[in-house]
Amino acid sequence: MFTQAVIALIGLVSIRTGKTEDVTPCTTNCGCWARLEKQITVYRGDYSAAEENLKENKKNFGKIIAATVLGSEKLKATVAPVLLSAAQIIHECEEALTTARPAILDAEKKVAELRALYDVQQKLKEGNGELQLHIQDDTNINTAKEVPKANLGNINKKGCADDLNTPDAATIDKTNIETEGPTPKVITHVHVEARCQRDGTPTNGCHDGQLGQNGKLEFSLTYDSKDTNDLATWLADTATKKQISATEVDFIGNLNTEANTAIKGLKSSNPAPACSKKIRDYKTIADNSKFNLMVTKALIGKTDAEAGQESKEPELAAAITKYYGTEGTKFEDQLWKAIERTPAYLGDQKKEQTTKIEKLETLTEVGEATARGLVKQLAAGAQARQTASGDDQSAENQCGGKKEDECKDGCELVEGVCKPVKQGEGENKEKTGTTNTTGSNSFVIKKAPLWLAFLLF
């Protein structure tokens, strides 16, 4: 009963872990060629996915940058908390890839070299080259037909096939990759195989008779992992093909061990944890430790708040719901769609064209559209200042020409000189008889960010 319970428990654990069975080592050139590809594929997908996700995040980050200039004041405020989180996500991924790239490149290089060696070994092994001497007309070797085959050391053109599962049926994944050792050295020796037939009878060897007419002397090369040398027995039975030498060869050296170490090292440098995050995902953005602070500053209006001064619930949740939907459920529609619908400007060498941020595909286009947006803002600001300056100068001229009894209707005497009434002062003087500080407050309000004014009023 106890034994049955243990067996059942082991079976249950195996099912829950979902662990792939450990597999036996490869034993053939093409089997090892396939096994290496399966091993590195376990991590290659994570690395390539990290690069692709970083590329996509950077593209979307460019849209955020463009929106900070081209967007409405409300959109700019909505973007502000996302900007910081998105930048940190991209930075962390780039840091991870800085470590990961050399690791995957080194592993890919070693695996490619080792697979190439297994492929070459397979071509050598299947070369089937021979040197055949067939004595025919007399006991002399003096015609081409007496050398019917002379391609000793031939290399087969066909190496290992593209289908990995044909030479190696094993399944390799993250549950068993750690148990994989270095692929074996399938070829460690090269042998000369020989056969000598003294006449037309296949069983008549050359060890007990002279090679003569219709005799055959044949040599070939074979490759394996054995040190077999049957020279001694062959000399007593030369009519039978045997390996008469065993020369040690090592095509691989330490490369199999180095490749195995490099592949397993990809686990520790895997960029997936840092690079699987997407900046268009609300939860990813909101997980940033400074997200609530930026919401407090940009969306609630407490611009002087710093760490530890973040707004609390329900104020914080209310702001998030207003701009991103309840717990970010409208993050895509209310932020990203708004960003992508925002007008942008590009030139076509002759005139400026209006497009949308979603159409900006490259960093160059983002840069141009943002620059053109800045130019428009600078031009608008300059125009506003020029208009204000003109109005001030006009008022100065109108009041300056008036006599003392005419100095009214927006003008006042200052030390005997008629000058324009400063904004707010006249009204305050009428109400209180003294100069109020409203003018100073008005200046502060004018200088506050437009988006803050939008939120507060």
Swiss-Prot record:
Annotated propeptide span(s): 441-457
Gene Ontology terms: cellular component: plasma membrane; side of membrane
Keywords carried by this UniProt record: Cell membrane, Glycoprotein, GPI-anchor, Lipoprotein, Membrane, Signal, Trypanosomiasis
Region Disordered: start-end pairs: 385-406
Glycan-bearing residues: N436
Topology in membrane: Lipid-anchor; GPI-anchor
InterPro entries listed in its UniProt record: VSG_C_dom_sf (IPR027446)
Claim: Cell membrane is one of the keywords in the record: yes
Cleaved signal peptide residues: 1-20
Lipid tethering residues (GPI-anchor amidated serine): S440
Cellular compartment(s): Cell membrane
Biased composition (Polar residues): 385-397
Function: VSG forms a coat on the surface of the parasite. The trypanosome evades the immune response of the host by expressing a series of antigenically distinct VSGs from an estimated 1000 VSG genes.
Protein name as annotated: Variant surface glycoprotein 20
